[in-house]
């Protein structure tokens, strides 16, 4: 990946990443010698960031150099998925360099919109290649996107990026709620955020078969990982199991043993915080901005989706072929933007339930 501040200053014309922050830091005395940007390849798993790029070793060396040059500890600032990478780094360096390293070299950590417990949008992205960003774009752009890079092609691509799997939600129902209640439900809620995925029939004029259980129509966080495994290929399943854990550990002895197990280092619910008494952790999040929390989904075959597209005069179907192993249309999921229930609280928005 590109390195230095230029690697993440501006994403595109009018869209800045770190450039405005860099400019404001420069105004209060920071310069190129005192600011380092650690760019990483977010497609890679945490293990492979070190195995291929020696990313964490380089980051460790940067902190040690700063301590020698300036005689004081550094501040680590992260954004979004960078928060997860940062937490893995703290556990990695504690394991590799000893329990005193963080206390010696890092003054504080500032996490901006950190993804420590994952994000809801990761689940539909892996299942369907969709999220609110894609289903709400104008119809013309949606047509072009589906024509040249379909949702199923996007989902297949997302599932090859082991790094993005670190964004899958962690902690199960204890954190995200169950089928009747979630901690962030509003007082007058008629729908609970605990049902992360709410499936509706492909044909809205029909009901689900009696054989479809409530657990199949409403998928909670604890059931989500198994649901994801059932709807994705073996390669993705092996990658997930060999790189990440999604649980919530309460046993102290197991938490201590997890400190030696690198697949738990992206999950702050299964490992202890770093042994650094003076380390300060600042977590900054937006307030008052609607955020994706749960989804309405429709589950049908590739033939169902092909028929729907043909009805809309979108006859491209190259990516919706039949399964080679069974000869039957593939089972796929889509965010269901048809669901518009003004009498529900929260009100569905383009197939999503928005939370704080």
List each language-model region with its residue ranges:
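Glycine-rich anion/phosphate-binding loop at the beta-strand->alpha-helix junction
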Residues: 286
């Amino acid at each position: 990946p590109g390195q230095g501040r230029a690697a993440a200053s501006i994403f595109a014309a009018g869209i800045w990443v770190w450039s405005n922050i860099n400019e404001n830091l420069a105004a209060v005395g920071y310069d190129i010698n005192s600011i380092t940007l650690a760019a990483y390849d977010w497609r890679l798993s945490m293990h492979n960031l070190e195995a291929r790029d020696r990313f964490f070793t380089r980051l460790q060396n940067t902190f040690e150099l700063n301590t020698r040059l300036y005689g004081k500890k550094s501040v680590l600032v992260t954004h979004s998925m960078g928060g997860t990478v940062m937490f893995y780094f703290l556990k990695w360096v504690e394991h590799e360099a000893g329990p005193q390293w963080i206390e010696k070299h890092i003054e504080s950590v500032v996490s901006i919109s950190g993804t420590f417990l994952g994000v809801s949008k990761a689940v539909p992205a892996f299942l369907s290649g969709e999220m609110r960003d894609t289903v709400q774009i104008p119809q013309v752009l949606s047509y072009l996107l589906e024509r040249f890079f379909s949702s199923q092609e996007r989902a297949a691509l997302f599932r090859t990026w082991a790094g993005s799997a670190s964004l899958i939600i962690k902690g199960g129902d204890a954190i995200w709620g169950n089928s009747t209640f979630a901690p962030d439900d509003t007082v007058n809620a008629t729908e609970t955020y605990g049902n992360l995925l709410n499936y509706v029939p492909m044909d809205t004029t029909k009901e689900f078969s009696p054989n479809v259980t409530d657990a199949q129509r409403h998928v909670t966080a604890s059931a989500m990982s198994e649901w994801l495994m059932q709807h994705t290929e073996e390669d993705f399943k092996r990658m997930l199991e060999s790189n990440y854990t999604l649980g919530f550990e309460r046993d102290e002895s197991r938490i201590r043993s997890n400190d030696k197990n690198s697949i738990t280092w992206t999950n702050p619910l299964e490992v202890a915080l770093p042994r650094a008494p003076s380390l300060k952790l600042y977590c900054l999040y937006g307030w008052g901005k609607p955020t994706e929390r749960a989804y309405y989904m429709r589950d049908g075959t590739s033939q169902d989706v092909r028929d729907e597209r043909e009805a809309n005069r979108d006859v491209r179907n190259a990516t919706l072929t039949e399964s080679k192993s069974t000869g039957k249309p593939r089972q796929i999921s889509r965010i269901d933007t048809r669901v518009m229930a003004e009498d529900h609280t929260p009100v569905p928005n383009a197939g999503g339930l928005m939370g704080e």
